Regions:
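Long, low-complexity, Lys/Arg-enriched
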Residues: 1-407
Length: 407
């Protein structure tokens, strides 16, 4: 039932057979929950919510549910609240959950342009390529001293952005009872949004719907109680193994909107605020943009096709059923999968990697320290390991073993 014509190329088949079923199942689950909870207003968060909104508009038949596209990002919601609590501990709860954190990622988190602080960075014995391991980042005197010297600039910029965000949220009528929809994983943007609305005195009751809620959601529950709900896995309600973790980069790439991430907001007239975006990451690599678009177009084609099948209403597919094709590629990629998808670049808070990695085992034998750095940065670890080791090994089991060792 989930098979594409043999005449279609790899990316079309992948979009139709792997991404399409997941997107379709998630959309039906979302609509079911909105109706059961009688939620009449929903905001799809950029950028991952873009393709989900497209799927929603193909499937939803309830005209009483109004849907909107809210142009936000982790950065655009996080930076405006830094002035409320700019302690280093508060910042750590907002940083990327990656075990390896670059200085660029740190500056992205605080909303400042790293290039403007080159001299200050050098004074603190750091450079643009510096990175830190999460487990001992609190003990890095150079970084904590740098952060202390940046406090005034952080707060000043944060308050400016807070005022503009407040106006944008008012413009978009973000108030009352509503749902937000995004890819996942820990409710960070929901926390930042809820904290902003509470600070400006806007009544709100937010229900978050995600493709998954990861175990580290707990870090966002300290100062805000969040209503989180996950489709594939939901650690806020019950334990179910997070099987997308080893290929989170590939997974997130499938949901990307064809525009840059939201940076902040700017006033273009007395009554209008607009989102200011970063340049689109794939603008200089049109081939990768076309690959992602082709995959997404075929996923939507799958939804159109399956929605036209009357018999489909008699089937009861679980989230595991509809995730299985994508999971197979993510956890146990073939050499063809790695060749076709592994060279796609992945951008995450200032860091750029290729999904399948760049080097073979021979390189890491000569540069062993680089292996740890690259493995921690990589976002499709099963493909990375297979490309490096080549042998037919159980790479998902190896990944889980490495995770336990890391702890």
């Amino acid at each position: 039932m989930f098979k594409k014509k043999a005449s279609y190329d790899y990316y079309q088949k992948f979009g139709y057979e792997c991404f399409g079923p997941l997107l379709w199942g998630y959309t039906h689950w979302l609509i079911k929950n909105l109706k059961e909870r009688e939620i009449k207003k929903v905001y799809f968060l950029s950028r991952d919510g873009y393709i989900i909104q497209k799927a929603f508009e193909l499937v939803n038949s309830d005209s009483d549910i109004e849907n909107h596209y809210l142009e936000v990002s982790r950065r655009s919601l996080r930076v405006p609240i830094l002035w409320m609590d700019s302690s280093f501990e508060a910042l750590l709860s907002m940083l990327s959950i990656s075990e390896k954190i670059s200085l660029q990622s740190f500056f992205d988190c605080i909303g400042l342009d790293m290039d403007k602080y080159r001299e200050l960075i050098t004074e603190h014995h750091l450079n643009k390529d510096s990175f830190f391991y999460r487990k001992n980042i609190r003990n890095n005197i150079n970084l904590t001293n740098l952060y202390r010297h940046l406090q005034n600039d952080i707060k000043k910029n944060s308050q400016t952005e807070f005022s503009l965000l407040q106006t944008y949220l008012h413009q978009m009528r973000v108030e009352g009872e509503f749902a937000i929809v995004d890819i996942g994983w820990s409710g960070g943007m929901q926390r930042f949004l809820q904290k902003t609305l509470n600070k400006i005195g806007v009544e709100n009751h937010i229900t978050g719907f995600y493709t998954g809620v990861a175990p580290f959601y707990i870090r966002n529950m300290k100062d805000e109680k969040l209503n989180l709900n996950g489709y594939l896995f939901d650690y806020s309600h019950h334990y179910k193994e997070d099987e997308r973790s080893p290929f989170v980069g590939l997974y997130e790439t499938l949901f990307l909107e064809g525009r840059g991430s939201v940076k902040c907001y700017r006033k273009i007239s007395d009554n209008l605020i607009t989102a200011e975006r970063y340049p689109y990451e794939y603008k200089t690599n049109n081939n990768e943009y076309l690959i992602i678009k082709k995959i997404q177009d075929e996923a939507l084609k799958f939804i159109k096709d399956i929605e036209s099948m009357e018999i489909i209403k008699y089937f009861n597919f679980s989230s595991d059923d509809l995730f299985s094709n994508l999971k197979k590629v993510g956890l146990n990629p073939s050499w063809k999968d790695i060749k076709k998808l592994g060279s796609i670049h992945f951008f995450d808070e200032g860091e750029v990697t290729t999904l399948g990695g760049d080097h073979l085992l021979s390189f890491y034998l000569l540069h062993p320290k680089q292996l740890k750095k690259d493995l921690l940065s990589n976002r499709w670890k099963t493909a990375f390991l297979k490309k490096m080791l080549v042998l037919p090994l159980p790479y998902y089991k190896i990944y889980k073993g490495l995770k336990k060792y890391q702890k």
